[in-house]
């Protein structure tokens, strides 16, 4: 027997079982992690294709290896499709992740020790926007802006004051946990006053931007980064866009050979498939449903007496502030998980609790919207979440209520078939 000719279930029963069990897990829960989604069968097929065998250092028509004719076509398709999707002149589809997309922009535009101004982690920013444990916080002089202490909205006056004081080389807009729209035009006004570069990280809202449901940063930012999963419903990966082709050339060199070696051609092919899906009219309807579902989820939780940060949402994210309820984010997320609802604990702005505990939870609607959930379904989900939270306020042992909600979850998700 030649092991290299076997299928997965023949070669590695352990990994095969893990995949089977993970499929069951994904199909049997209400997925509310805001950064997760379900890719289409077409994207899955492309991602598992034999393009994984091909090394292709460099860029189309400028490779360091021969035999790249077909993968060049795949990468060019991905580039042209995403440029059309976002109406921009430059795109790089090679970043392995959103973090590496951000790193490539830093490498292209900054020198070690330069000042960067980004949203603080506890206000909803991302690790790669200057957080102390991250490379961006170690290599650069990172200054953070926060949200307003009363409204929890981005404080553009504070950003302007900090920019004038610190004269950053780069101003970063973007977030991992902020439920409201961003005024990219206002960011550009601030940037122009201090002579900085402007990077917009739209990893969470890329789908909203692509469909016109959120202001596009393309006309305002020198560089725009994103992941290709989340609201874009593609494979896990990164993306860099710009209206400025000269900056694009710098970014190309920064990513390769500056940061990465060979690109993942099977992932790039899957990105191309996702971008083609994103260009279809049905995708805009999907994004509109994602937003409507988030509003329904937020409203149902508010009706049950729970504080929703900023009073609602403009996108796919709902942040539940549990401080007045005496519940930690960790306790809530773990109890919800046992009840068949997956989300994540999340810091609340000006949170004094440990980031490993937190005072809130982050909920998101993309994944269940992909399965077919509508507003009425998310109203039910909101009440399920509230039931669990109510139980945590009143009882140390929430197991009976968790089982009750788990039964309700099972009945609801049976209406929305998963992968065949």
Swiss-Prot record:
Its EC number is 2.1.2.1. Keywords: Amino-acid biosynthesis, Cytoplasm, One-carbon metabolism, Pyridoxal phosphate, Transferase. One of its GO terms (biological process) is glycine biosynthetic process from serine. It is found in: Cytoplasm. The modification N6-(pyridoxal phosphate)lysine is found at residue 230. GO terms for cellular component: cytosol. Its cofactor is pyridoxal 5'-phosphate. SUPFAM superfamilies: PLP-dependent transferases. Pathway: One-carbon metabolism; tetrahydrofolate interconversion; Amino-acid biosynthesis; glycine biosynthesis; glycine from L-serine: step 1/1. The record marks 229 as: Plays an important role in substrate specificity. (6S)-5,6,7,8-tetrahydrofolate binds at residues 121, 125-127, 246, 354-356. It comes from the Bacteria. GO terms for molecular function: glycine hydroxymethyltransferase activity; pyridoxal phosphate binding. It catalyses: (6R)-5,10-methylene-5,6,7,8-tetrahydrofolate + glycine + H2O = (6S)-5,6,7,8-tetrahydrofolate + L-serine. Its main location: cytoplasm. NCBIfam families: PRK00011.1. Belongs to the SHMT family. Catalyzes the reversible interconversion of serine and glycine with tetrahydrofolate (THF) serving as the one-carbon carrier. This reaction serves as the major source of one-carbon groups required for the biosynthesis of purines, thymidylate, methionine, and other important biomolecules. Also exhibits THF-independent aldolase activity toward beta-hydroxyamino acids, producing glycine and aldehydes, via a retro-aldol mechanism. Homodimer. PANTHER family: SERINE HYDROXYMETHYLTRANSFERASE, SERINE HYDROXYMETHYLTRANSFERASE 1. This is Serine hydroxymethyltransferase. The gene is glyA.
């Amino acid at each position: 027997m030649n092991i290299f000719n076997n299928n997965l279930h023949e070669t590695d029963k352990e990994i095969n079982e893990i995949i089977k069990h993970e499929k069951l897990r994904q199909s049997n829960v209400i997925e509310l992690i805001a950064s997760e989604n379900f890719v289409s069968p077409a994207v899955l097929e492309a991602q598992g294709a034999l393009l994984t065998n091909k090394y292709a250092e460099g860029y189309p028509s400028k490779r360091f290896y021969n035999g790249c004719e077909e993968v060049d076509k795949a990468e060019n398709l991905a580039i042209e499709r995403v440029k059309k999707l976002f109406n921009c002149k430059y795109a790089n589809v090679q970043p392995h992740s959103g973090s590496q997309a951000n790193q490539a922009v830093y490498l292209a535009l900054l020198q070690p020790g330069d000042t960067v101004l980004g949203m603080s982690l506890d206000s909803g920013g991302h690790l790669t926007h200057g957080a102390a444990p991250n490379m961006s916080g170690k290599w650069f002089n990172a200054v953070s802006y926060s949200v307003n202490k009363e409204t929890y909205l981005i404080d553009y006056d504070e950003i302007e004051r900090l920019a004038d004081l610190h004269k950053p080389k780069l101003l970063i807009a973007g977030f991992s946990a902020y439920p409201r729209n961003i005024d990219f035009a206002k960011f550009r006004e601030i940037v122009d006053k201090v002579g900085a570069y402007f990077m917009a990280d739209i990893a969470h809202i890329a789908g909203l931007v692509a469909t016109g449901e959120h202001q596009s940063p393309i006309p305002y930012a020198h560089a725009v980064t994103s992941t290709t999963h989340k609201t874009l419903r593609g494979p896990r990966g990164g993306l860099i866009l710009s209206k400025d082709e000269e900056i694009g050339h710098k970014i190309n060199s920064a990513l390769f050979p500056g940061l990465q070696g060979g690109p993942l051609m099977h992932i790039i092919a899957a990105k191309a498939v996702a971008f083609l899906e994103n260009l279809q009219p049905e995708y805009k309807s999907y994004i509109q449903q994602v937003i409507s579902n988030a509003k329904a989820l937020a409203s149902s939780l508010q009706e049950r007496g729970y504080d929703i940060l900023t009073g609602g949402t403009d996108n796919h994210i709902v942040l539940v502030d549990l401080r007045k309820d005496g519940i930690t984010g960790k306790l809530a997320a773990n109890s919800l998980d046992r009840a068949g609802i997956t989300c994540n604990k999340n810091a609340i702005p000006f949170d004094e609790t440990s980031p490993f505990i937190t005072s809130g939870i982050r909920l998101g609607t993309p994944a269940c919207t992909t399965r077919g959930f509508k507003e009425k379904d998310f109203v039910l989900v909101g009440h399920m979440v509230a039931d669990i939270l109510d139980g945590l306020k009143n009882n140390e042992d929430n197991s009976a209520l968790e089982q009750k909600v788990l039964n309700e979850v099972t009945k609801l998700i049976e209406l929305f078939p998963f992968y065949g």
